[in-house]
């Protein structure tokens, strides 16, 4: 049985390291990207089962990257990974779920596995 492959698009090394560590420990295979463009290339080139996507990326917004990901692979779950504040209701209309950067990734495992 192959591990679920998760693409993490996050430009902060400390968050990326924590996500990778926790997802690896839970049995996920983690692919890492630090820009929206890099994430889109990996999504196009590799089999990816789910995406954790930072909203504030250096080259694009999470909404723009998510829209392109859904164009490429309409059924892929794309979960927002960010500090959620007053923009929560607006942003969540565009994503399948979300993970606050202060939470443990286990809270979204069910979303990644569907």
Language model features with spans:
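Active-site residues of response regulator receiver
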Residues: 54-56
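Short amphipathic alpha-helix used as the core "switch/output" element in two-component signaling
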Residues: 41, 63-75
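Two-component/phosphorelay signaling modules centered on CheY-like receiver
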Residues: 13-31
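As written
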Residues: 48, 62, 90-104
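Acidic catalytic/metal-coordinating carboxylates
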Residues: 35, 61-64
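Conserved acidic carboxylate
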Residues: 10
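Acidic, metal-coordinating helix/loop segments flanking the phosphotransfer/catalytic sites
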Residues: 32-50
């Amino acid at each position: 049985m192959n591990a679920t492959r998760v693409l993490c698009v996050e430009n902060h090394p400390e968050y990326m390291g924590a996500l990778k560590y926790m997802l690896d420990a839970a049995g996920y295979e983690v692919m890492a990207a630090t820009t929206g463009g890099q994430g889109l290339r990996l999504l196009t080139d590799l089999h990816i089962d789910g995406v954790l996507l930072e909203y504030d990326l250096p080259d694009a917004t999470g909404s723009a990257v998510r829209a392109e990901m859904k164009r490429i692979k309409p059924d892929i779950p794309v979960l927002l990974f960010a500090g959620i504040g007053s923009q929560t209701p607006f942003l969540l209309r565009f994503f399948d779920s979300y993970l606050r950067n202060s939470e443990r990734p286990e809270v979204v495992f069910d979303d990644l596995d569907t």
